[in-house]
């Protein structure tokens, strides 16, 4: 479809000349997306990304499922014009498979909409059988951990589902470790480590609001005495700890926000990523563990690996790679759409 007000003026829906963009076409696309998640997510189908934009053939549309709640972001005019039809078809498909959906909430409070010539806004979707009077909170279970998801005020759709299996992988190294969980947001990595038997966990974030939610999540799981929370700038904290040389932590997790959202700021982002990784490597003892990631597709895997190699050289350590991971399969990577390949996640031992 075409939008003269957008920097992305043309978005391709299909390369099949025989396709007609009628209700049957959209119903088929939605069925493919839902059936794919049922297959790859299995028991985790209750909490996953149901529609991932171009990767599912819906350019500009994201839909996350948190149990009985669907949270949508509509970032292209073509999807905006069809959203009521798409929501109805998605609801129909989920109900046919036995899923109970109570509400759909739109999180269209994104500046990108203005670049598409659309207004920002949020609110419950009005469709037969859906509620519009909920308080904006839902409790989900991921990897055995309970979380209170605030889908009205939380970042993006309320919870970062793409790190689901990376959190589980990180927790497998945590038993008996003293963990420093940086950029914790609502506490997920730290809680996974605490539940896995970490000796101690310090979870750090610059946002007191995020830490309030993290503490609440810890209490939901009976882990409030196993995790300590600190409101601080991670860059400043790592600087102080690095000055102390090898410190009290033998496992550091770095899950920063995207340091770049455009190609113009990649160089600055590389410097930021290198700074936190270099300091983490200086803090960790030989034999310690590092989990590190980037969620920006502009920070390609080649750039990320080169940055890590430079940081290791400057820290005078070697990196023993344990795992290289990406986003979960509910965020599928379409090889001809590079933007869908965005999350890099590495587990290392410092040797």
State where each predicted segment sits:
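Non-catalytic accessory regions of SAM-dependent methyltransferases
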Residues: 1-67
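Non-catalytic substrate-recognition/targeting regions of SAM-dependent transferases
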Residues: 53-64, 83-159
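Conserved SAM-binding loop of SAM-dependent methyltransferases across substrates and taxa
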Residues: 172, 186-199
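Conserved class I S-adenosyl-L-methionine
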Residues: 176-185
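Conserved SAM-binding motif I beta-strand of class I
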Residues: 200-205
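S-adenosyl-L-methionine
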Residues: 209-253
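C-terminal catalytic and target-recognition region of SAM-dependent MTase-like enzymes
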Residues: 248, 275, 289-351
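Mobile active-site "lid"/loop adjacent to the S-adenosyl-L-methionine
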Residues: 249-279
């Amino acid at each position: 479809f075409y939008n003269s007000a957008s920097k992305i003026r043309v978005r391709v829906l299909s390369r099949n000349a025989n396709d007609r963009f009628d209700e049957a076409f959209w119903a088929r696309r939605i069925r493919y997306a839902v059936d794919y998640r049922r297959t790859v997510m299995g028991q985790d189908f209750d909490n996953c990304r149901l529609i991932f934009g171009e990767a599912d053939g819906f350019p500009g549309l994201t839909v996350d499922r948190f149990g009985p709640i669907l949270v949508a972001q509509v970032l292209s005019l073509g999807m905006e014009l069809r959203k009521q039809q798409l929501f109805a078809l998605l609801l129909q498909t989920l109900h046919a498979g036995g899923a109970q959906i109570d509400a759909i909430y739109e999180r269209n409070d994104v500046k990108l909409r203005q670049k598409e010539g659309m207004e920002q806004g949020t609110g419950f979707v009005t469709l037969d059988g859906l509620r519009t009077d909920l308080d904006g909170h839902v409790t989900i279970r991921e990897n055995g951990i309970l979380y209170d998801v605030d889908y009205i005020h939380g970042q993006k759709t309320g919870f970062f589902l793409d790190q689901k299996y990376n959190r589980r992988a990180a927790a497998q190294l945590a038993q008996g470790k003293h963990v420093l969980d940086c950029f914790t947001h609502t506490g997920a990595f730290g809680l996974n480590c605490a539940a896995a038997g970490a000796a101690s966990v310090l979870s750090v974030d610059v946002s007191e609001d995020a830490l309030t939610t993290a503490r609440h999540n810890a209490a939901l799981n009976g882990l409030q005495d196993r995790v300590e929370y600190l409101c601080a700038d991670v860059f400043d904290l790592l600087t102080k700890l690095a000055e102390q040389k090898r410190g009290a932590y033998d496992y550091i997790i770095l899950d920063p926000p995207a340091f770049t959202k455009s190609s113009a700021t990649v160089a600055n982002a590389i410097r930021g990523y290198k700074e936190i990784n270099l300091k983490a490597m200086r803090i960790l003892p030989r034999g310690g563990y590092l989990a590190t990631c980037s969620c920006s597709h502009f920070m390609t895997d080649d750039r990320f690996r080169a940055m890590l190699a430079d940081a290791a050289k400057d820290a005078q350590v070697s990196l023993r790679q344990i795992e290289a991971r990406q986003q979960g399969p509910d965020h599928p990577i379409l090889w001809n759409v590079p933007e869908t390949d965005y999350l890099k996640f590495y587990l290392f031992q410092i040797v």
